[in-house]
Amino acid sequence: MNPHTNLNNVFDFPDLPMLLPKSEALSVTTDFSVPPVQQGAQQFHPPRNLGPQLARRWSCGDSQHADEPPASYYHNLGVALHNHFQMSNQHYLSDFDCPTTVSPISSAHETGQLPQLSPYDHIGNQDPHMFSPHAYGNSMIPDNSYFENASRSISAPNVGNSTLNPSLMSSDNAQSCGGRRRFRTNFTELQSTFLEDSFKESHYPDHKAKKYMADFLKIPEDRITVWFQNRRAKWRRKEHRQRDRTRNESFSGGSNSFDFACFSAQHPDDGPNAKHPNSFGIPNQPMSLDQFPMNTEQDFPEFPSLQEHQ
């Protein structure tokens, strides 16, 4: 027996008889006569079983037909492609521990009959750097470096992988994660005192004054500009609060000093004819109309006319 014979392929055993179904093995007799074949017409030849011949030529090392693979090649190739398509769906789950799919026929990879498959064969002629591995499954998220864009997006966390990616922790990414990063300057006591004194002199220093303060305090000029902006905002808030507090105090003080005695109700014991001593010592007596005589004829004093003055 040939040592290269594949036991899984029946075509590598040409000595075994090819069993045909009984319906095909029985000879059928026909009563009608077959018409003669016309000269020049295309004749139909039934296909022959070339499996044993191809297998024999492949196993015997016939150089003339060496480019004709056996039938086991196509079987192994189909199984390998099926496994490859299953693994391509899990290719981007690089952060998870995915079990690799093993081919049921081990001779497919050991004998070297299958070509080496690239992990990007299922993508086509696209750039392999277009899609980056993502931690949340086969979502096929495009990488920003493929589009040659200066802006970078926030990278997803590494799920299932305890080791951090050092490229994600770079200073470039740390500054771009939050968009525009805000820097906070810590001023010393001397610098704060100097700036407060300058603010008392002028709330809006000019460019020359800010440049002098920057050179004296060893602080960038833009930091001094930001400090004055924040200080003016703080001063305005303080002024608004003080103005509101003063308005509230004046309103509450005026309402407490107001005398509501004039609006007090009359005492129930006081009758309409009650007599109360007043501050002048004159007793209150009921008045009658006879005490006020009505004079119908009154003598008005004569005022000098304008002609006398003239």
UniProtKB/Swiss-Prot annotation:
Transmembrane segments: none annotated. The gene is dsc-1. It is found in: Nucleus; Cell projection, Axon; Cytoplasm. Residues 281-298 have a biased composition (Polar residues). Transcriptional regulator which plays a role in the expulsion step of defecation by controlling enteric muscle-specific expression of exp-1 which is required for enteric muscle contraction. Not required for exp-1 expression in the PDA neuron. Also involved in controlling the length of the defecation cycle. Keywords: Cell projection, Cytoplasm, Differentiation, DNA-binding, Homeobox, Nucleus, Transcription, Transcription regulation. Gene3D superfamilies: Homeodomain-like. Expressed in the bilateral sensory neurons AWA, AWB, AWC, ASE, FLP and PVD. Also expressed in the enteric intestinal and anal depressor muscles. This is Homeobox protein dsc-1. The lineage of its organism: Eukaryota, Metazoa, Ecdysozoa, Nematoda, Chromadorea. Residues 180-239 bind DNA. GO terms for biological process: cell differentiation; positive regulation of defecation rhythm; regulation of DNA-templated transcription; regulation of transcription by RNA polymerase II. Residues 262-310 are annotated as: Disordered. Disruption phenotype: Shortened defecation cycle length with change in periodicity of the cycle. Expulsion defective with distended gut and lack of enteric muscle contractions due to lack of exp-1 expression. SUPFAM superfamilies: Homeodomain-like. GO terms for molecular function: DNA-binding transcription factor activity, RNA polymerase II-specific; RNA polymerase II transcription regulatory region sequence-specific DNA binding. PROSITE patterns: HOMEOBOX_1, HOMEOBOX_2. One of its GO terms (cellular component) is cytoplasm. The keyword Hydrolase does not apply.
